[in-house]
Amino acid sequence: MRTLACFVAAGMLALSASAANAETVAYGEAFDTLFRIDLAGHTAAEVGPAGFYGSQRIGNLSGLSYSLDDDLYAVVGGMNALSRIDASDGSATILGNLGLAGQGDPQRNDALDLGMTFSCDGTLWLVSAYAGKLWTVNPQNGATTLVGNTGHTITGLVALGNTLFGAGGRDDNTFYRIDTDSGAATAIGSFGDAPSTWINSVSMSFDEKGTLWAVLNYVPPAPGSVSVPDWSDLAKINVSTGEITIVGPIIGPESLIQVGMKGFAVGPPRCQTGAGTAILTPVGSPPWLAGLAALLVALAGWTLRGRAIR
C-alpha cells in the first residue's frame, strides 16, 4: 500500500509539472482570418482564412468562443450565420442562419455587431451592440431565441461558470454583469483611464487560472475620425471593478495592420461537472494528461479506502 501511495504522489507531482508547462492556446479572428495569439509576447501568427460558402466569402467574423467540447464557434456577420472554426487551418463550416435579418444597421448592410460566448451549462449566448438585445443560440443550427434587451451597447460577452459578463465600448467604456433571465446589463465599473482611444469592440475570454483577457478593437474608428491604430491591443480586465490594464499591441504580419480583431478565445477552463474531485487540465495539454489525472484520482481514492478499512 505504501508503494502505491508513493506512486500516486509521484504521479501527481509529474502531473502538476506537466500542467504548469502546458501552453495556453489563444486565437483571434480578424475579418476572415484566424490568428494564433501568444499571450506572453502579445504577437499573432496567421493560421488561415475562413474560406467561402458557395461563392460568398465568409467574413466579418466575431464572437469567437469555445464550446464545452473545445470546438471553436464564431458569428459570421457578413452572412448573419453561426459557424464552427477549424483551429488547425482557420476554415469555417456554416451551421445555420441566425434568423435576425432586419434588426441591424440599415446603413451598414444590416450589421448587428455581434458578440458570443458559451457558459458552463452549455448555453450559447449572443448579443448585439447595435440592437441592444441578448439571445440564446442553438449550436447545431444557429436558431436564436430572444432573452431580452440589455439596455446598453454591449460589444462583447464572456462567461465565468454560468455568470455572464458584457463589455461596452463606443463611448460606453463600462464592464457589466448580464442577467441571463432578462438580458438586462448592470454596471460593475468603468474601464478606467488606460484605454485612451475610442474602442469599437471588446472581445473577452477567461484563461484556466481565471484571468480575464481581452482584445480591444479600434476598427472602424469613431464617427468622423480617420485615425486608426495599426494594431488591436491585448488587455486584462478586473472582474470586480471593470478596470482595464493594457498589456500591449498584438503585433502580427503585415496583413493584420489596421484590421480589427473582433473575435478572441483563450483555451477554456474545464467546467466542473458531477461529483467527485475536479482536475484542471489546461487546453493544449496532450491527451494522455487527462487520462493520467483520472487514473491517479482513482488510485488515490482506492488507497484511502484501503487505509480506512484497516
Task: State where each predicted segment sits.
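Conserved beta-propeller blade signature
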Residues: 25-29, 71-75, 123-126, 164-167, ...
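Beta-propeller fold detector
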Residues: 44-52, 93-100, 145-150, 185-192, ...
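Repeated scaffold domains used in trafficking and secretory/extracellular systems
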Residues: 55-65, 103-117, 152-161, 196-206, ...
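A cross-kingdom C-terminal cell-surface attachment/processing module
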Residues: 287-306
